[in-house]
């Protein structure tokens, strides 16, 4: 029981470190769309985008398919 608890604790800590590393990468300069003011991001979160810039943008969503719901993000 104690060993299982320890394993779970280590797994959670590692997951948090992984998330923090990924968030740090998102802050890096991003590749913008043709207009220089757009990027593509997932509907669930502006941080889940294809090139790391949507967290700085406003998300406007459209739904091409039920399984692939993406947003166009524009800097206002």
UniProtKB/Swiss-Prot annotation:
Organism of derivation: Phoneutria nigriventer (Brazilian armed spider)
GO-annotated cellular components: extracellular region
Localisation per UniProt entry: Secreted
Tissue spec: Expressed by the venom gland.
Sorted UniProt keywords: Disulfide bond, Knottin, Secreted, Signal
Propeptide stretch(es), residue numbers: 16-36
Name recorded for this polypeptide: U10-ctenitoxin-Pn1a
Secreted keyword on record: yes
Top-rank taxon, per record: Eukaryota
Secretion signal, residue range per the UniProt entry: 1-15
Cystine connections: 39-54, 46-59, 53-73, 61-71
Family in the record: Belongs to the neurotoxin 02 (plectoxin) family. 09 subfamily.
Protein biosynthesis is among the record's keywords: no
Recorded domain comment: The presence of a 'disulfide through disulfide knot' structurally defines this protein as a knottin.
């Amino acid at each position: 029981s104690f060993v299982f608890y320890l394993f779970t604790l280590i797994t959670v800590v590692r997951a948090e470190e992984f998330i923090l590393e990924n968030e740090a990468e998102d802050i890096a300069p991003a590749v913008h769309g043709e207009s220089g003011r757009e990027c593509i991001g997932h509907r669930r979160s502006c941080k889940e985008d294809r090139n790391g810039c949507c967290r700085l943008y406003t998300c406007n969503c459209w739904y091409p398919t039920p399984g692939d719901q993406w947003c166009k993000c524009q800097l206002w």
